[in-house]
Structures are given as structure tokens and as C-alpha cells.
From Swiss-Prot:
Phosphorylated by PKC/PRKCZ, and other unknown kinases. Phosphorylation is necessary for viral transcription and replication. The N-terminus contains the majority of phosphorylated sites. Ser-249 is the major site of phosphorylation, but is not necessary for most functions. The N-terminus consists of a long intrinsically disordered tail. The central part contains the coiled-coil multimerization domain (PMD). Forms a four-stranded coiled coil structure. The C-terminus constitutes the alpha-helical domain that binds to the nucleocapsid (N-RNA complex). Keywords: Chaperone, Coiled coil, Host cytoplasm, Phosphoprotein, Viral RNA replication. Essential cofactor of the RNA polymerase L that plays a central role in the transcription and replication by forming the polymerase complex with RNA polymerase L and recruiting L to the genomic N-RNA template for RNA synthesis. Also plays a central role in the encapsidation of nascent RNA chains by forming the encapsidation complex with the nucleocapsid protein N (N-P complex). Acts as a chaperone for newly synthesized free N protein, so-called N0, allowing encapsidation of nascent RNA chains during replication. This is Phosphoprotein. It is found in: Host cytoplasm. It comes from Sendai virus (strain Fushimi). Residues 412-445, 413-445 are annotated as: L protein binding. It comes from the Viruses.
Amino acid sequence: MDQDAFILKEDSEVEREAPGGRESLSDVIGFLDAVLSSEPTDIGGDRSWLHNTINTPQGPGSAHRAKSEGEGEVSTPSTQDNRSGEESRVSGRTSKPEAEAHAGNLDKQNIHRAFGGRTGTNSVSQDLGDGGDSGILENPPNERGYPRSGIEDENREMAAHPDKRGEDQAEGLPEEVRGGTSLPDEGEGGASNNGRSMEPGSSHSARVTGVLVIPSPELEEAVLRRNKRRPTNSGSKPLTPATVPGTRSPPLNRYNSTGSPPGKPPSTQDEHINSGDTPAVRVKDRKPPIGTRSVSDCPANGRPIHPGLETDSTKKGIGENTSSMKEMATLLTSLGVIQSAQEFESSRDASYVFARRALKSANYAEMTFNVCGLILSAEKSSARKVDENKQLLKQIQESVESFRDIYKRFSEYQKEQNSLLMSNLSTLHIITDRGGKTDNTDSLTRSPSVFAKSKENKTKATRFDPSMETLEDMKYKPDLIREDEFRDEIRNPLYQERDTEPRASNASRLLPSKEKPTMHSLRLVIESSPLSRAEKAAYVKSLSKCKTDQEVKAVMELVEEDIESLTN
């Protein structure tokens, strides 16, 4: 009965108020809807929402939702983005003027009074808290220009700036981080939220301080399209109710206590990225945390006005790059790659140039470019060295092959020399007797195989040995070439000259001759002896005059004696 009386009292206040009083009525109805549709344990657990002002014209309505264990959804009509109600309002009432919407609202209130005979909590629950469409506009037009709730504010911001949503998708961040609280799934009638809890927030949120104009149907359609793409990212990590309020409570309390100018736009995306429960995606973002940033650091474009921190960080990065270059030069010097650190800084080699540029890089793109250049230059230098090594190996192989040819020819030449030496040794063994006699075992001296005429040694008749022709420098002289002093003694000079022509060679001894072979050989012995020229001529002349063998023997004995006297 108290609740019905409270509703009737509010209805009477609505009748006395101007048409602009619908804002307080919707707040009250949303308050009752929250009371009736939630369990007593949930209401007794957290009563922070009781302290929020309901009908204050300065701030927006309660901007938070609460979901109890996946059961009923508690939300204020001024902030709840009811999917079915939003679609029906956009599709059916986008062209309806605000006056008709206000008239329809009053008709719904009259219908509610007509059924006021039913008393008790059941009738109120059937009219207000059944979870369906109660006929009351849950999101009335913003006639007074009050700030919208946080969810709608972010939805319109994301619709106006679709590039922010593209950044979220490109960086792989969950949309709950930048897009604010999640919206219920449309497929289940708005009654379930897939286990995702709503993050409660204060009415004086940092993102809702700007005054927005009346939303256009295009913006609402953009919001609906954004919310329809939400189930594709349902697998992302949901925000837990234990961590989300703790991470956002400092900025909410700060803005709630200090206040902010009415022209303040929603906070930038970096505040949501740098929160405690989200991974640090941007490594090179050197912006200070939320608690240390001032209110005036965020202009309309979302970028900081004062570049002091960025300049300091840039100078710090340059100092770090310089120190890293010094460390790299020291390391290369210690490893023996370069002689000194000055060589690393002043070298014009491609690898060193790209290494210095990579160490001085200001962002990842430049560093990646320089590292790629470093790798390619190192690969090029290594390929060049490989080619040089191949050429060197080829030259070494050619020289080895030439050495093999030289060794082969030298070995063949050595074999020829060895065979020639062995043949000379065998010839020398034939000429000289190395004591192979069986009858003269006492004497150890070597006896020559060719014996000269001597008085002591006449035991063996000596025959002419043709091998004497090859001894020393003695050359074969033809038989019939006479000396000049013998010309006067030639009886028939024409006949002698005629016989000289065919015998003027070493092969003349093979031709038939009138002279006996023995006489011819004796003459050769005399000619090859070390006697003087006159003595040789005298002995040859006396030998030619011999008629018997005894005379020849006597002449040869005289020749041998003269030879012995010369040799001794």
C-alpha cells in the first residue's frame, strides 16, 4: 500500500509539473523497478546506489548497472541501453516529434491510473517490474540538454570516431576496455549478459562531463550497428566486478570532488589502456599514469598540449642510444672485432652504418628497417667473402695440379736417369774385372780386362777390343785418309782418291777392303795411341812395309814399349 501511495503521489506531482518533469518520473520508476526486480540480499549487500541523487538537474542519472549472479538485470531507465526498446524506438519513432512522444507517455500514465484499483505489490510488479515493455519511455528525449549517461556517451563517441574502434581491433584489445560497459545480448531478450558483469560508476563520470546535443537517428543507428557486432568478441576476457571498480574509482572520485568544466570532452583512450587489469600493449607509450595526469592535459583532439614530457623522454631515449652505442663499441673492441671504439663510430662499412642507425632508432619501424639493412649487408659481405674463398680455392687447386704434373715429369726423368746410371754401371763392370778370377785368389788388386804390352806380363795374347774406341776422346779415323807427308809415296793417286770417297765414314770398316782386318786393327791401335804425330806416322809406315807376321809383331812390340814409357 505504501508503494502504491508513493506512485500516486508522484503521479500527482507529475500532473502539476511542466512537460519537462518526465525526467524525475522516469528516475523514480527506474528506482522502483530496481527495488522490485532485485533480491533483498543484493539490496542489503551494497547500498551505495541509495546515496546517489535521483532528481538533481545538475548531473545525469545513475550510470551503472548491476547484474546479480546472471539472473535479473537491474538498471535505471535513463542509462539502460535496452536493446529491444532501442530498436523499436528507432524503427517506429525516429520520425515522431517529441510532442507525440510526450503525449504517448501521458497516455501510459493514465492507463496506469485506470488500473490503480488493483492494490498490493503484485499489481505494481505486473505494471512495472515484469521485465517486459511497461509502456513507459525508458529513454526519453533529452529536452533539457542534460548530459547523457556514460554508456550512451561512449557509444556516440565511438560512432563519431570510428577510427578508435579500428585501433581497438588492430591492437587486439577487448572492446570492453575502450568501449565502456558491455551491453546485453539481443538474442536472449536482454535478460542475460553472458556472465559479464556491469561496472558501476558514479554519476559524475569523467567521460560524461561534456554537454551533448540531442542524438540524431544516424548516431543511434551507428550505436546499434556497434552493439550488433559485439557477440563476435564474446570470447574476450570479461571484466570482473572485483577489479573494475577499483581501477576506475580514483578518477571518478577525483572528478566528483573537484568537478570539471562543462566543455570537457570524454577522456582519451590511453586512460583505459593503462588501467591495471589490461595488458600493456604499447611498450613505447611513455605517458604518465592516470593518477598523475592533470585535467587540462587532454584537449579536444585527445593529445597532450604540453610536449614537455615527450621532449624529456626523447632526450632520454637519445641518451640511452648513445650509451648503448658506447656499450656496443666496447663489446666489439673486447671481442677483437674492431681495434677501437672510434673505428665503430667512424667506419663506412655498410654493416657498421646500419648497426649505428639501428641503435639510434626512435621507433620500431625505423629499427626494423635498419635491422633488415644490417642483415642484408652482412649477408652480402659474407657472400662476397665466400666468392673470394672459392676463387682462392680454385687457384690452390690449379697450383696443386701443376705441382702434380711437375712431380710426375720429375719422377719420369729420375727413372730415366736411374736406368741410364744402371746401364753405365753394367758397362763399367764389363770393362773392368772385379776379381772374378778363380786362379788368382791371392791378389786382392783388380786386374784390367784389357792388358797392354809389358815385359813382366806376357802370358796372354791380347786381341783388339772394340770397346777401346769409346774410351776418352778418341775418334775413329778412316783408313785411307793419309797425311800430307805421305802423299809423295802414293803410287796411284787417282786410284787412292777413288777408294777414299766411299770409305770416308765410320761405316767404312764394314765395307770390303784389300787390307786385312788384322792390319787394319793394328793401324787403329797405333792411331789411337798417345804417341806423337811423327811417331804414329813412322810406325804406320813401317807396319805397311811388313811382309811377315814376325815383322808385324816386332813393330807392335816397339809401339807398346813406347806407349808404356809414356804412361809410366
